[in-house]
A protein has these predicted regions:
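Well-ordered beta-strand positions
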Residues: 31, 85, 190-193, 255-256, ...
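N-terminal FAD cofactor-binding segment of flavoenzymes
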Residues: 1-35, 132
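A glycine- and small-aliphatic-rich helix-loop capping segment at beta-alpha/alpha-beta transitions
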Residues: 5, 138-142, 256
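Short glycine-rich loop/turn motifs
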Residues: 27, 184-187, 258-260
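FAD-binding beta-loop-beta segment adjacent to the flavin cofactor pocket
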Residues: 242-264
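Redox-cofactor-proximal catalytic regions of oxidoreductases
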Residues: 23-56, 181-182
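Flexible, glycine/charged-enriched surface loops at secondary-structure junctions
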Residues: 229-241
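Predominantly flavin-linked oxidoreductase catalytic cores and closely associated redox partners
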Residues: 56-232
Length: 265
């Protein structure tokens, strides 16, 4: 779920219907779950999503890359950035990864060495614990006052038999209450058009039980009568997982820019 305001400002001449998204949020529900029941609770301000869009990040990024190319940007698909170039205290670009190496790192007949890609400004948007951003943050000592906490999210996309109209968030079961467990997190269930939903669970990674599995927690949630009713008659299409920064403003570097580079996410 995302606020569409920035996209509308970025693409003022594009009709909202032409920007990839599944639906506009009409209603929302938040539940405190128990093993066999649920209690609806008021949605906190940060979960007020009426008018926001349900989007696929990959589809939106693909569309935005096409818009950028039309404006003259040059994309390097299937190319990773391996190393930051820092020259005389300034970030001057990156070195891309080698191509054409085997599983053991050996050079194949298609081997191509990595190349330097230099720029006046290098924009870092790697997400959690980016290896390039980490080097820059360390080099410029930007993490002296930041506190890092992490969460893990797993999700599934389902084709369902009946449409889901509301954006749903839950907390509580299957996680366990109590200081000794240190378990916190919750789930989402989002409509993706008339016949698909995204369902997922996020768990804070400072839990005490080393055997806790975020994947297993999601599978437990799917056995709840309410969730089971949403998925009944459907089929799972895809599955994925990612880490999420949980420390908010306290996890930001002391500066969002350094000579030759800036952080955007």
């Amino acid at each position: 779920v995302m606020r569409p305001g920035a996209l509308k400002e970025l693409f003022p001449d594009v009709a909202p219907a032409d920007i990839p998204h599944y639906t506009e949020v009409e209603g929302e529900k938040v539940f405190l779950m128990t093993k066999g029941g649920k209690v609806r609770i008021p949605a906190p301000p940060q979960l007020h999503n009426k008018g926001n869009w349900v989007v696929s990040v990959s589809q939106l990024a693909r569309w935005m890359s096409e818009q950028a190319e039309e404006l003259g940007a040059f994309m390097l698909p299937e190319t990773d950035a391996q190393k930051v170039l820092i020259d005389r205290g300034r970030v001057v670009g990156v070195v891309t990864g080698d191509k054409g190496r085997g599983k053991e790192g050996e050079e194949l007949s298609t081997f191509e060495p990595g190349a330097e890609v230099r720029a006046k400004v290098t924009v870092l948007a790697e997400g959690t614990q980016g290896h390039l951003a980490g080097v820059v943050r360390s080099h410029y000592d930007l993490d002296r006052d930041s506190i890092q906490t992490w969460e893990l999210g797993v999700k599934e996309v389902w084709r369902v038999a009946k449409p889901l109209k509301d954006v749903i968030h839950t907390l509580g079961w299957p996680l366990r209450f109590g200081k000794k467990y240190r378990e916190y997190g919750g789930s989402w269930i989002y409509p993706m058009g008339d016949d698909m939903v995204s369902i997922g669970f996020v768990v804070g990674l400072d839990y005490a039980d080393a055997t806790l599995s975020c994947h297993d927690v999601l599978q437990q949630l799917k056995t709840h009568p309410y969730v089971k009713g949403i998925l009944e008659g459907g089929e799972r299409l895809t599955w994925g997982a990612k880490t999420i920064p949980g420390s908010g403003i306290w996890g930001l570097p002391s500066r969002l820019h350094v000579p030759g580079a800036l952080f955007v996410g």
